[in-house]
From Swiss-Prot:
<dbReference type="GO" id="GO:0005886">
    <property type="term" value="C:plasma membrane"/>
</dbReference>
<feature type="transmembrane region" description="Helical">
    <location>
        <begin position="235"/>
        <end position="255"/>
    </location>
</feature>
<keyword id="KW-0520">NAD</keyword>
<dbReference type="InterPro" id="IPR010096">
    <property type="entry name" value="NADH-Q_OxRdtase_suN/2"/>
</dbReference>
<feature type="transmembrane region" description="Helical">
    <location>
        <begin position="75"/>
        <end position="95"/>
    </location>
</feature>
<keyword id="KW-0813">Transport</keyword>
<feature type="transmembrane region" description="Helical">
    <location>
        <begin position="297"/>
        <end position="317"/>
    </location>
</feature>
<feature type="transmembrane region" description="Helical">
    <location>
        <begin position="35"/>
        <end position="55"/>
    </location>
</feature>
<dbReference type="GO" id="GO:0042773">
    <property type="term" value="P:ATP synthesis coupled electron transport"/>
</dbReference>
<comment type="function">
    <text>NDH-1 shuttles electrons from NADH, via FMN and iron-sulfur (Fe-S) centers, to quinones in the respiratory chain. The immediate electron acceptor for the enzyme in this species is believed to be ubiquinone. Couples the redox reaction to proton translocation (for every two electrons transferred, four hydrogen ions are translocated across the cytoplasmic membrane), and thus conserves the redox energy in a proton gradient.</text>
</comment>
<feature type="transmembrane region" description="Helical">
    <location>
        <begin position="374"/>
        <end position="394"/>
    </location>
</feature>
<feature type="transmembrane region" description="Helical">
    <location>
        <begin position="8"/>
        <end position="28"/>
    </location>
</feature>
<keyword id="KW-1003">Cell membrane</keyword>
<keyword id="KW-0472">Membrane</keyword>
<feature type="transmembrane region" description="Helical">
    <location>
        <begin position="159"/>
        <end position="179"/>
    </location>
</feature>
<keyword id="KW-0874">Quinone</keyword>
<keyword id="KW-1133">Transmembrane helix</keyword>
Length: 485
């Protein structure tokens, strides 16, 4: 097989991040220098982001039977790279106080980013599985990075064992699908399913097992039990990656699979997904009500957000509107989550034991860190879906696509879930403006706005507000990024 220049250009983000992994690995072997390795990682991720412009010029193509590079792949690759970049910038000040090996953190983030890019381009069940494993394996190490803390170690063990079990379900499901359809490619699978094969018991069993495996990775109810514990135990920068890059990449590839292989045409699959969405929306929001730990609260909140996205997945028959909904919602979710977890990371830096994740740590923050409090307030309002924020645009799209597809019971769940969510998001926002305690147990550095992490948080807040008022640039970008069949 000869590789053309066009194909190499199409694979640029993957090649650049892969090269960065090798360079950082050699740099660590040569000399341990935290600043140098952090800089190399950030430069590599930025170069991969910039290379997307050249990929766009090359046009859509099937690079290998496993990978398709098109506008859709570029959008999700961009979102994964942005999340990875933010994770590295939040990690740098956090690692300053960390006494064990610092440099491997960036290596693991880069390898996980490789998995995310592979998922964004996946066009085959083999590349889907490889991508999921490539993003999951480094996360085992990242979640347990603060291994001297009991919670971090416990979270890593839970995540490793449950993730391995979920992967086995996913792989067994793929085997059953292959046994029935004779293909692993999304497109060929779609042709097989179009021939009235969706009623075959073996195929439905395979799809059911795949939904279990993917449901775990997306932390949908009832496969969500690991989520709050892992979000709480993992270091704040790692929780950022878990909540954003990991979820976005996996949901992106599931959306492509459902688009090419019309799995949603099966009434049984639609009912199962509908129940998962309904349970995730209501359970995620209800459990978040009682949380006093911000990372646990955001963990339960992410369960409900994936439930909202599942509504758009079930409504995929409505075509372009559904694709647009997922793109806009995930962009809003990315920037809102980066801002919220970014504030927690800044408050927890440098590392000195457990993160500043107690709600009490943020009480009265406005009186000594007003801009940081304003940023956190904007992020909470966006996650709640309040008008004039990007979160509202995403929520509006979900409701519109639900109504358009006559999914009334799920649309009702979205409305009720959003109303419940409003309470706990506002509870976090209000606590920022109460009287500050006499003695502060945790606080962000006074120069936080001049750090790379501070800049990322401020840009996220700005994007959430600007795109909330004027979302057209984002909508146009998402419309350009439709998969070319």
């Amino acid at each position: 097989m000869t590789i053309t220049t066009q194909q190499l250009i199409a694979l640029l983000p993957l090649l650049i991040v892969g090269l960065t992994v090798v360079v950082v690995m050699l740099s660590i072997a040569w000399r341990r220098n935290h600043f140098l390795n952090a800089t190399l990682s950030v430069v590599g991720l930025n170069a991969a982001l910039l290379s997307l412009w050249f990929v766009g010029q090359a046009g859509a193509m099937d690079v290998t039977p496993l990978m398709r590079v098109d506008g859709y792949a570029m959008l999700y690759t961009g979102l994964v790279l942005l999340a990875s970049l933010a994770t590295c910038t939040f990690a740098y000040p956090w690692l300053q106080g960390y006494n064990d090996n610092k440099e491997e953190f960036y290596l693991l983030v880069l390898i996980a980013a490789l998995g995310g890019i592979l998922l964004a381009n996946a066009n085959h069940l083999a590349s889907l599985f490889l991508g999921i494993e490539l993003i999951s394996l480094p996360l085992f190490g990242l979640v347990g990075y603060a291994f001297r803390q009991k919670r971090s170690l416990e979270a890593a063990i839970k995540y490793t064992i449950l993730s391995a079990a979920a992967s086995s379900f996913l792989l067994f499901g793929m085997a059953l699908v292959y046994a029935q359809s004779g293909s692993l490619s999304f497109v060929t699978l779609g042709k097989s399913l179009a021939d009235n094969m969706l009623s075959e018991p073996l195929l439905l069993a395979g799809l059911g097992l795949m939904i279990v495996g993917l449901g775990f990775k997306l932390s949908l109810v009832p496969f969500h039990l690991w989520t709050p514990d892992v979000y709480q135990g993992a270091p704040a920068p790692v929780s950022t990656f878990l909540a954003t890059a990991s979820k976005i990449a996996i949901f992106g590839v599931v959306m492509r699979l459902f688009l090419y292989a019309p799995v949603g045409d099966s009434e049984a699959v639609r009912v199962v997904l509908g129940v998962l969405a309904f349970a995730s929306i209501l359970f995620g929001n209800l459990m978040a009500l009682t949380q006093t730990n911000i990372k646990r609260l955001l963990g339960y909140s992410s369960i409900s957000h994936l439930g909202y996205l599942l509504v758009a997945l079930i409504a995929l028959k409505s075509g372009d509107m559904s694709m647009e909904t997922v793109g806009v919602y995930l962009a809003g979710y990315l920037f809102s989550s980066l801002g919220a977890f970014g504030v927690v990371s800044l408050m927890s830096s440098p590392y000195r034991g457990p993160d500043a994740d107690s709600l009490y740590s943020y009480r009265g923050l406005f009186w000594h860190r007003p801009i940081l409090s304003a940023v956190m307030t904007v992020m909470m309002l966006s996650l709640a879906g309040i008008p004039m924020t990007l979160g509202f645009i995403g929520k509006f799209y979900v409701l519109a696509v639900g109504v358009q597809s006559n999914l009334w019971w799920l649309t009702g769940a979205v409305v009720v879930g959003s109303a419940i969510g409003l309470y706990y998001y506002l509870r976090v926002a209000v606590s920022l403006y109460l009287n500050a305690p006499q003695q502060l147990n945790r606080d962000a550095p006074s120069n936080w706005a001049y750090s790379a992490g501070g800049v990322v948080v401020l840009i996220s807040a700005l994007l959430v507000l600007v795109l909330g008022v004027w979302p057209q640039p984002l909508i146009t970008l998402v419309q350009l990024a439709k998969p070319l069949m």
